[in-house]
A protein has these predicted regions:
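Conserved subregion of the PPM/PP2C metallophosphatase catalytic domain
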Residues: 1-4, 8-9, 13-14, 18-205
Length: 205
């Protein structure tokens, strides 16, 4: 989740989002309905900053991810077999502005070796001394170069690359990445699926 604005109010708002979402999911609400309920709560909030982008996903043992993307920058799914990318686009608007905004859930399947990157816009919008943005193309190149490295190494490389790109410039927005890699060997197209796939490995910075 990423809240509009900066400082303590934004941090408190993100904390409240996490708490509210856990309460909704813990109450056996479907994830789309839980996000809709959370959106209504935020809409009624008196906080000065109350616009929040959110990506919420549930990871299944077979590699499937069930998710809702409420206006968050689209996570990048790197397919190990084809070395191609799929962007997980929004399934609803940011939380807060509209109390009756609808949200839908979608699913994506991660095969062994696949990688998923979640990031805040402070990553791609980081500027160098000439005013150029870091951009998604640089992010994709790093993911391809590090596609066989661990999730932690990939996350650390992304963050260090952004810092090197913007030396001496204070971050204008939050810079956070989460890298999720599904472990296990990449299967041949005609090979049977393993009965118990290894769980994803996760690194966050």
């Amino acid at each position: 989740a990423d809240a509009s604005g900066h400082g303590l109010l934004a941090a408190l708002l993100v904390r409240d989002v996490y708490v509210g979402l856990r309460m909704g999911i813990g109450g056996d609400l479907k994830i789309a309905r839980a996000v809709e309920r959370l959106n209504r709560i935020l809409n009624k909030s008196r906080l000065a900053t109350k616009f929040v982008s959110l990506f919420y996903g549930e990871f299944e043992a077979n590699g499937e991810i069930i998710y809702v993307n409420a206006g968050h920058p689209g996570p990048l799914h790197l397919h190990a077999r084809t070395r191609s990318f799929t962007e997980l686009e929004s399934t609803g608007m940011v939380l807060g502005p509209s109390p009756n905004a609808p949200y839908t859930r979608r699913a994506v399947k991660m095969e062994p070796g696949d990688l998923l990157l979640l990031y805040t816009d402070g990553i791609v919008e980081a500027h160098d001394q000439r005013g150029r943005e870091f951009g998604l193309d640089r992010v994709r190149r790093i993911l391809l170069d590090y596609r066989k490295r661990s999730a932690r190494e990939t996350a650390e490389k992304l963050l260090s690359a952004v810092r090197e790109f913007s030396p001496g410039r204070p971050a204008e927005d939050d810079r956070t990445v989460v890298v999720i890699r599904r472990t296990g060997r990449l299967r041949q197209s005609n090979a049977p699926a393993p009965l118990a796939p290894a769980p994803p490995s996760i690194a966050a910075s």
